[in-house]
Amino acid sequence: MAQYGHPSPLGMAAREELYSKVTPRRNRQQRPGTIKHGSALDVLLSMGFPRARAQKALASTGGRSVQAACDWLFSHVGDPFLDDPLPREYVLYLRPTGPLAQKLSDFWQQSKQICGKNKAHNIFPHITLCQFFMCEDSKVDALGEALQTTVSRWKCKFSAPLPLELYTSSNFIGLFVKEDSAEVLKKFAADFAAEAASKTEVHVEPHKKQLHVTLAYHFQASHLPTLEKLAQNIDVKLGCDWVATIFSRDIRFANHETLQVIYPYTPQNDDELELVPGDFIFMSPMEQTSTSEGWIYGTSLTTGCSGLLPENYITKADECSTWIFHGSYSILNTSSSNSLTFGDGVLERRPYEDQGLGETTPLTIICQPMQPLRVNSQPGPQKRCLFVCRHGERMDVVFGKYWLSQCFDAKGRYIRTNLNMPHSLPQRSGGFRDYEKDAPITVFGCMQARLVGEALLESNTIIDHVYCSPSLRCVQTAHNILKGLQQENHLKIRVEPGLFEWTKWVAGSTLPAWIPPSELAAANLSVDTTYRPHIPISKLVVSESYDTYISRSFQVTKEIISECKSKGNNILIVAHASSLEACTCQLQGLSPQNSKDFVQMVRKIPYLGFCSCEELGETGIWQLTDPPILPLTHGPTGGFNWRETLLQE
């Protein structure tokens, strides 16, 4: 069970001040469409729940029912913030229903399937009418009344259908509301803001920018033609009713990453979090600095408890997956709507067992639902592919910093003391102490690499050239991939120092003393002893800047591609976790991430993490594509999904 904190005296005082304002509500007749749970509150109070907790439970479940509120309260019994007076954040959106909504849903599905996820996929199709604003739990009823009152005043003043125009730019596609209708909607939003302030004392800031439905943004430049064509297929004149809808979210997690649990987990230690499939986890990158590889620190939506959890038990979820639906009103039709027709209904917060998790949540991290790409199975001109792969499991990580003392005697002779240690190690001219900065891979690391090679063979993928970092772990991984491909006697590995990882990560004031290619070949590793590197070891410097590392990786990758042109289509680079990003980002015409985001991304790439980059014709522009093999997941290390990790949203 995770450890919990206690509210501070200041927080307790704020809570008392906030809830001192709560006054008994008079009974009112229920009206269709109102966002109201007075009778539910009375029932909860009669059951003995404190007023503040009952109001928080109703606000956190959208006032759906007494049972839902009770379930929320019981599941949050260990939540250290259960009695925190911090209110939720609310937002007012226009959402489409009817034939146009279905067309937009089709666009969402097709664009994600063809081009991968972009920022627009984080939220359902909508028009933003205001910024997020806070509202006390005790005033949510009045907020709903404010919306109903405003809609009733404006219902006959909107154009039907709402006129929309398609707009595209290099990194944005959307449907914009024509100016006259947009002005009417802005006045409607301003009227709601005034009504809400009058009834609830909240401050609502109407949306000041052009009103629009975002279709796509923050996507790869190469995807623009495809996305534009899909957007042009949307008939904006289709029948559509628009509903003014209120959603809320927990303000504490507004800037967190939203994840969803796909496998159950029972805690083994006091600081670990229990996982239930279907639950959502909030994760802040700022809280991950001290976590072990393969683990993250997060907070459960269902319980409010925080703790450590294995990274490969969860998958990314849309930002809006945890939002709460509070109610909606049609702005065009005379009937009110309390149900949403778009999407899979998760925003209505049905219990997890009713959401059809097996149908709505693809297990993208553990097992990607795709057909292997058969790179050389199609007739005609072949596209050029660059495969980048991380090395296998390394000895110093498995057996610790002082692993040498476990398997070398006083005379420097290697002695195998564990089944996961290799039978023998290559001789080093500088002595066995050179292994401290240049560790080999384990027996399991060799197996991982052979598995990848065998998978490439089964998918009919032909590798024409192999390059690798000078680190022994990378050379051994490349050699074992070739063994799995049954090419160890036909292909030679070109050891390229320019592919070494960011030298800032090397401990001490000197670079590793790598084994020369001639000695690697003498140790029966398939190394090309005649290869002349593009960036020799003498050009590498200790503690290089991030910009220098990124530039070096891009430069050597371009030179490798140029060197292999007309000599085969497919290049394999075996290097480090950072290489999957550093060697492919600028090839796609993208700007490098900042160093902080880069480091966070690298943490997510497991041993033998594998990505595929394909040239678009002969344009010199490359794009990430589905690899020809399935991902490899092992231990607590997070499974690797290239779309989620490498694609810049």
From Swiss-Prot:
GO cellular component labels: cytoplasm; nucleus
SMART domains: SH3, UBA
BP GO terms, sorted: collagen-activated tyrosine kinase receptor signaling pathway; negative regulation of bone resorption; negative regulation of osteoclast differentiation; negative regulation of platelet aggregation; negative regulation of signal transduction; platelet aggregation; regulation of osteoclast differentiation; regulation of release of sequestered calcium ion into cytosol
Pfam families listed in its UniProt record: His_Phos_1, SH3_9, UBA_7
SUPFAM superfamilies: Phosphoglycerate mutase-like (SSF53254), SH3-domain (SSF50044), UBA-like (SSF46934)
Example GO molecular function: ubiquitin protein ligase binding
Subunit structure comment from the entry: Homodimer. Interacts with JAK2 (in vitro). Interacts with CBL. Part of a complex containing CBL and activated EGFR. Interacts with ubiquitin and with mono-ubiquitinated proteins. Interacts with ZAP70 (ubiquitinated form).
The name this protein goes by in its record: Ubiquitin-associated and SH3 domain-containing protein B
Species this protein is from: Homo sapiens
Gene designation: UBASH3B
